[in-house]
């Protein structure tokens, strides 16, 4: 189960790993909501996410 579940409240905060608003990841160190593109299990540390995806170069 994804601890960062925006579906229920529209916002979430996974400690220091992720902060989301309206199901868009505003910062991401680990997989959060729909921040990472398909096939990307987590974003690299410090990766900046835009809208609901991060650049594939951020993937680990």
UniProtKB/Swiss-Prot annotation:
Entries under Gene3D superfamilies matching the protein: Metallothionein Isoform II
Residues that, per the record, bind a divalent metal cation 6: 36, 40, 43, 59
Record-listed a divalent metal cation 3 binding positions: 14, 18, 23, 28
Residue numbers spanned by region Beta: 1-28
Binding site for a divalent metal cation 5: 33, 35-36, 49
GO molecular function, one term: metal ion binding
Pfam family, one: Metallothio
InterPro entries: Metalthion_dom_sf, Metalthion_dom_sf_vert, Metalthion_vert, Metalthion_vert_metal_BS
Binding site for a divalent metal cation 7: 49, 54, 58-59
UniProt: a divalent metal cation 1 binding residues: 4, 6, 20, 23
Binding site for a divalent metal cation 4: 32-33, 43, 47
Keyword presence, Metal-binding: yes
UniProt keyword terms in alphabetical order: Metal-binding, Metal-thiolate cluster
Domain notes: Class I metallothioneins contain 2 metal-binding domains: four divalent ions are chelated within cluster A of the alpha domain and are coordinated via cysteinyl thiolate bridges to 11 cysteine ligands. Cluster B, the corresponding region within the beta domain, can ligate three divalent ions to 9 cysteines.
Family: Belongs to the metallothionein superfamily. Type 1 family.
Identification of the protein by name: Metallothionein
